[in-house]
Amino acid sequence: MANPICISPLKFYDDFHKQNRYRSFAYGYVAPLITNPNVVSPFQLIVSGNVSEVYVRSANTNKRVTDNVVERFKDAGLRNVSKNSYNILLFLGIFPLSGVIDYEGQYWLEIHSGEWYYSEVFCFDNNIDDCLKVEYWNPEGDFALKNGIIVLGSENFHFILLLKSELGKPEYSFEEEATKRLGYSFIESQVSKKTYKFNTVIPEYLCDAMRIIRLCSQKKITCKGETYDAITFNMEVDWQEQGDLASVTCEFDVDNIITNLGGFKHEALGGDFNNDYNNDYDIE
């Protein structure tokens, strides 16, 4: 069995030993996905059958810390969806999982949906004030993958990602179109833009998940209580020396563009081309 098709922030594998911390260059270091207690980030993956069992395991001991909580997850939005001959296991994450795990710590999921699937490590954290939240979705339609599909439009599915970061100093850019005549520049149009930036250090599986952000038509970024509706999103990945983490610089624009069409002057009082003020070229 190969890894299931999964490009969610909470990635799944066919063997928990494929988690990022077990890679040779990670040396056991855990770079978990951050969530609020009782909240598991929305995810979806291609599976071979309907879901029947869900367990939560401790990342410290790899032992189960819950009984089968599949019904609790179903109440919170877990279900199987059939699309284009694929069986997709969706978790919308729209309701909290109260009573499943009520305290901070690092955990991972063990799910049986035709076969066994194992999630990446996630961290329940009571304090996410220093986190930046990225929510992205695409109501216009689904995304196609080789041997899979990302279901978005038909299920109102939203990805949610919390990152240890905050918005840095913005950049200001200007675009200008001008015509030069007789040594003078005549401005035809000017555009001023403000671009926001942030930097975060994350493992490869989160870099994979963030590829989807740019493709989605709807992108909301929240930092320190302020929410921005991004109209563009770009990311640049710089792998660190050890190799298991990347410094990712992200930038996005919002609809704050200022435009000057230039050159047009409204003559409120009218005028005449030769100043004789008869009826030949009177302008109202």
Residue locations for each model-derived region?
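Preference for solvent-exposed, low-hydrophobicity sequence contexts
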Residues: M1-F143
